[in-house]
C-alpha cells in the first residue's frame, strides 16, 4: 500500500471557494491542526498527529523563507523538494494550467510529505491549455493571448504573493 514507508499523500482542496483557504495555498497560519483541515481532511494515506505536526512545521519553514538569501534557500530545501517544485511550475506555466495551485482556486495538486520534505505533484489537467473559465461571465477566447502568456508571471500578482511555494 502506498504511503506505509514512502511518506504521506494529501490532495488539498477547498471546502468553500468563498473562504480564504490559506491551507490549500500552503500558507502557515498557526500550529493548530484545525487550521489545515482542507489538507488533513483530504489525506490519501493514514496520518497521525506526528504526521500533521511534521507537515505544519514544513509549511512554517516554507512561509517564513523569503528566498532572498542563500541561507533562505538552504532552509527552504529542508522543507521543500525545490527541484520538484521548479519542475512542477515549469510545466504548469508551459501548459497554462489555471486550474491548479497558481489559479484562483489554488487546488488540483497532490502534496507528498516524507521526512518533513514537501513535494508538489500534478493532478487534473483537463482544464490546461487555457481552457479554465470559472467565475468568468464572458470567458476569454483569445488563443494568441494564451500562447504568449508570460512564463515569469503565470498568475496574477495577488495570487502569486499568496502562494508561498511559488513566491518563496
Model-derived segments and their meaning:
Residues 1-168:
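Phosphate/dinucleotide-binding and metal-coordinating scaffold of catalytic cores
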Amino acid at each position: 500500500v502506498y504511503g506505509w514507508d514512502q511518506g504521506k499523500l494529501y490532495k488539498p482542496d477547498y471546502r468553500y471557494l468563498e473562504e480564504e483557504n490559506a491551507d490549500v495555498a500552503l500558507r502557515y497560519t498557526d500550529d493548530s491542526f484545525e487550521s489545515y483541515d482542507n489538507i488533513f481532511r483530504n489525506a490519501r494515506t493514514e496520518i497521525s498527529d506526528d504526521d500533521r505536526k511534521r507537515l505544519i512545521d514544513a509549511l512554517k519553514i516554507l512561509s517564513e523563507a523569503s528566498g532572498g538569501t542563500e541561507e533562505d534557500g538552504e532552509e527552504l530545501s529542508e522543507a521543500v523538494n525545490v527541484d520538484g517544485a521548479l519542475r512542477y511550475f515549469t510545466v504548469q506555466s508551459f501548459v497554462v494550467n489555471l486550474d491548479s495551485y497558481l489559479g484562483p482556486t489554488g487546488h488540483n495538486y497532490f502534496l507528498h510529505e516524507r521526512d518533513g520534505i514537501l513535494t508538489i505533484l500534478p493532478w487534473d489537467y483537463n482544464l490546461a491549455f487555457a481552457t479554465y473559465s470559472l467565475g468568468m461571465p464572458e470567458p476569454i477566447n483569445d488563443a494568441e493571448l494564451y500562447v504568449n502568456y508570460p512564463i515569469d508571471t503565470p498568475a496574477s500578482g495577488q495570487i502569486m504573493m499568496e502562494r508561498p511555494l511559488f513566491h518563496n
